[in-house]
Design a protein with these regions (language model features):
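Intrinsically disordered cytosolic tails
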Residues: 1-201
Length: 201
């Protein structure tokens, strides 16, 4: 837990820096995508914590201290706790990322307007004093690159965490808890249900 607190403090200090955030960065986080890679290293901690929870729940259910139905509320609560601990701290960058996205869209839209206007006048309105041929010109590729840059900014996230990371954390937090199903449902019934789901029945 101490290392986690240190990491939160590190994130807080980083967001106070004058960061050079690039809205067209391919990580869709203006260059902060490396933070997601760091957070992936918390996966073993999540698995271990879930295993501890699973052991405690199994003992309480087996001894009659807790009913199985209590898991219907406890499991979502555990996932929510993990989200607060490992995902929510990244929201500290949301304001800066949002400002970077808005600034990038504004700047690139202005540049795109000028470029498209010049492209239209040159190739569609005949204002081509150099007599350049369309075949082999780099203008069309530049127009496509500009379009890709604008799309990249539109897809930019306001937190340096992808949907893949969030889903991965949810899955690995649930996996250690799955054996608890055996306390209520026979193994063959569970396997049969899974096969029916996979086969679409």
């Amino acid at each position: 837990m101490w290392y986690l607190i240190l990491w939160w403090y590190f994130l807080w200090r980083v967001q106070q820096l004058n960061l050079n955030l690039i809205p067209t960065h391919p990580d869709h986080s203006a260059g902060l995508g490396y933070l997601e890679v760091v957070h992936l290293h918390f996966a073993p901690l999540i698995v271990a914590s879930s295993a501890i929870f699973a052991t405690a729940f199994a003992e309480n259910i087996s001894s009659g201290v807790m009913k199985f139905q209590a898991l219907y509320h406890l499991v979502p609560t555990i996932i929510l706790i993990y989200a607060v601990l490992f995902i929510c701290p990244l929201y500290i960058f949301s304001y800066k990322l949002w400002k970077t996205k808005v600034r990038g869209l504004n700047e690139y839209m202005i540049m795109a307007h000028h470029y498209v206007d010049a492209f239209d006048r040159k190739w569609l309105r005949g204002e081509n004093p150099a007599g350049e041929e369309q075949l082999g010109t780099g203008d069309i590729q530049s127009l496509a690159d500009l379009n890709n840059s604008v799309n990249t900014i539109n897809d930019m996230r306001i937190i340096p965490a992808s949907r893949k990371l969030i889903i991965s954390f949810a899955v690995i937090s649930i996996i250690p808890l799955l054996p608890l199903l055996l306390l209520k449902y026979p193994l063959l019934q569970i396997v049969g249900t899974l096969l029916n789901i996979l086969s679409g029945q």
